[in-house]
């Protein structure tokens, strides 16, 4: 599996976002990581659907949409997803991880499983054939700027 570079937009300077995006494009990164939080699965709220639309309108870099939300399979229609996009879902965010992965695939996107630091890798056993990759979390989900675990 090829490793891909996906810097987090959440850590960008929002007052200089156009310049940040230009620098990302010049750096030829693989994709942009966009954290979506609902205040339920994680205690924080962040970037939402309008922000994703703005990004899509201003860059051709594929998006890596990290859904830190309850029941992510029911939220996919909120986003204008394209075949270049990756969508990461957490096993803990839904009682039916297979359905969540299938819903991402049905949108034509690549499905990623997000693996929290405290989640054993065996949690992915039953979906390894269905996913396109793994987002390995180096911090507990929910807040930027944490120390790596």
Kindly label every feature range from the protein language model.
Residues 45-66, 103-112:
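Alpha-helix-loop-beta-strand connector modules within alpha/beta enzyme cores
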């Amino acid at each position: 599996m090829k490793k891909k570079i996906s810097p987090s937009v959440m850590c960008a300077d929002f007052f200089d976002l156009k310049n940040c995006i230009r620098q990302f494009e010049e750096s030829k990164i693989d994709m942009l990581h966009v954290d979506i939080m609902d205040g339920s699965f994680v205690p924080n709220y962040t970037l939402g659907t309008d922000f994703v639309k703005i990004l899509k309108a201003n860059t051709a870099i594929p998006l890596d949409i990290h859904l830190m939300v309850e029941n992510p399979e029911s939220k996919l229609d909120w986003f204008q997803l394209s075949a270049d996009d990756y969508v990461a879902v957490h096993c803990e965010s839904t009682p039916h991880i297979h359905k969540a992965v299938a819903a991402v695939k049905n949108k034509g996107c690549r499905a990623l499983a997000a693996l929290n630091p405290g989640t054993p890798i065996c949690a992915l056993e039953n979906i390894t054939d269905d996913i396109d990759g793994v987002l390995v979390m180096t911090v507990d989900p929910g807040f930027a700027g944490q120390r790596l675990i």
